[in-house]
């Protein structure tokens, strides 16, 4: 994951390719391990490991909460927050009872977060770096882990997005199409 912000006051000559267009970088990575029930399509996130660059962290507990929150929100988009539409294009999931979001039951059994304090040589608040938005990308690791688990069983499987139990079962059914 690589995240950057452009500051308008920076000097960069596009035609000459000289200068620095960006001074604010955030690096990170994530891994997820999942388990799939081949009969129901349900999945469980067993382990998640996240490494995120924080610069000079202003509050490690708040930063950890922001990283976890962004991860869970993104994981929801990738695994359960489906937006079905009818033939007229109207959304069918418009209430809390029809739009599924992650619950406590969906949380990873084990989540480890390592925050790397890298310092910051450029202007930011006390040398801190972005914590709220960049970790959002880490939730994709759950979708890729589910896809890889399915492909270990059905190599030609195609998993749609989000990876709902129905989507997982449909991907597992591809094996029958190729028999």
What are the residue ranges of the model-derived segments?
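C-terminal catalytic domains of large/alpha subunits in multi-subunit enzymes
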Residues: 1-179
């Amino acid at each position: 994951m690589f995240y950057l912000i452009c500051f308008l006051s920076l000097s960069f000559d596009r035609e000459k390719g000289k200068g620095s267009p960006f001074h604010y970088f955030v690096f990170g990575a994530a891994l997820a391990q999942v388990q799939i029930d081949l009969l129901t399509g349900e999945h469980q996130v067993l382990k998640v490991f996240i490494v995120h660059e924080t610069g000079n962290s202003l509050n490690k507990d708040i930063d950890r909460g922001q990283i976890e929150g962004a991860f869970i929100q993104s994981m929801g988009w990738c695994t359960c927050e489906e937006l079905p539409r009818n033939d007229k294009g109207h959304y069918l999931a418009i209430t809390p009872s029809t739009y599924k979001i992650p619950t406590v039951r969906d949380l990873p059994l084990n989540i480890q977060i390592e925050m790397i304090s890298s310092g910051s040589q450029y202007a930011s608040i006390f040398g801190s770096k972005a914590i709220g938005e960049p970790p959002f990308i880490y939730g994709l690791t759950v979708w890729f882990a589910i896809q890889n688990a399915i492909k270990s069983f059905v190599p030609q499987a195609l998993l749609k997005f989000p990876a709902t139990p129905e989507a997982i079962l449909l991907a597992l059914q591809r094996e029958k199409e190729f028999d």
